[in-house]
Amino acid sequence: MTQPVQTIDVLLAEHAELELALADPALHSNPAEARRVGRRFARLAPIVATHRKLTSARDDLETARELVASDESFAAEVAALEARVGELDAQLTDMLAPRDPHDADDIVLEVKSGEGGEESALFAADLARMYIRYAERHGWAVTVLDETTSDLGGYKDATLAIASKADTPDGVWSRMKFEGGVHRVQRVPVTESQGRVHTSAAGVLVYPEPEEVGQVQIDESDLRIDVFRSSGKGGQGVNTTDSAVRITHLPTGIVVTCQNERSQLQNKTRALQVLAARLQAMAEEQALADASADRASQIRTVDRSERIRTYNFPENRITDHRIGYKSHNLDQVLDGDLDALFDALSAADKQSRLRQS
């Protein structure tokens, strides 16, 4: 869901209010609110700076035009300032384009094996490692919240939390929100003795994580909470206490498991955060579906998402079917070199949002 175009005057006023709020020591007694205000301020700061540059350039241009009336030597300066004003005006227009309100958010990412049995589970593990390597390249923190492994060490399913360590307007969600869907792999499985290429698939789901669980309405009476013995790798070794937590949201049937934190309380807290992210995504996707049947097809669930990308090992090729992107550096992509692909997806998304505005 994108925000509508906002007028610059409204944003300038908001920026001034946020600046005052950040200077108030009382704000910092609430870390979550301070982080929200800080992120919003960081989002508006470049817009305000560009507006100030544009205003200054327009003033200089007006002065140069007055001078050129009596002195032709200022003609070149007028031309340069006209170009500068046009450039800054285009930048500001782009900054004011509709924007995903979750772009600064951290994420919860789930990887699930699909058709293809053991090979699919191994590919799901490859995808999880790819995202972990990408996060490491950007200095983000990755926590494995839950994992179910296959016989050969693949992932039947895994849940990761990926968090930025900085309050920036372009957070983890802004880069990784396009990963939800079905990912297909074409390669010779390790279980294939004849050397034949097989096709299998794995699913990825991505949710923006709310700043606080309280942002999403969750009724305690709607929850069933079970505790059991952890079976995951969990930090520095296998957790042998009954600290794993499974939360079932009865109205929707959503089940969230967390077992890799060190205590039952920590696992419950993380499971509630994941549940809040999934409920928030469900509510927003339903709103999109209600607003537009065309947008409903983009709902991020593995069962209903169409194939978004193919990883072809024999040809060392990756193809993103949504935008026709192709590259022959599959080995680098699986090592977390995803920025070129994500830049292309972001550019296509920006064009789409501009058309809708």
Swiss-Prot record:
A GO molecular-function annotation: translation release factor activity, codon specific
Keywords: Acetylation, Cytoplasm, Methylation, Protein biosynthesis
Disulfide links within the chain: none
InterPro entries with a match to the protein in the record: PCRF, Pep_chain_release_fac_I, Pep_chain_release_fac_I_sf, Prokaryotic/Mito_RF, RF-1
Main subcellular localisation: cytoplasm
Modified residues (N-acetylthreonine): 2
Domain of life: Bacteria
Key word Nucleotide-binding present: no
Positions of modified residues (N5-methylglutamine): 236
SMART domains found in the cross-reference section: PCRF
PTM section of the record: Methylated by PrmC. Methylation increases the termination efficiency of RF1.
One Gene Ontology cellular component annotation held by this UniProt entry: cytoplasm
Function in brief: Peptide chain release factor 1 directs the termination of translation in response to the peptide chain termination codons UAG and UAA.
HAMAP family: Rel_fac_1
Protein name: Peptide chain release factor 1
Organism name: Mycobacterium tuberculosis (strain ATCC 25618 / H37Rv)
Lineage, broadest ranks: Bacteria, Bacillati, Actinomycetota, Actinomycetes, Mycobacteriales
Gene transcribed to yield this protein: prfA
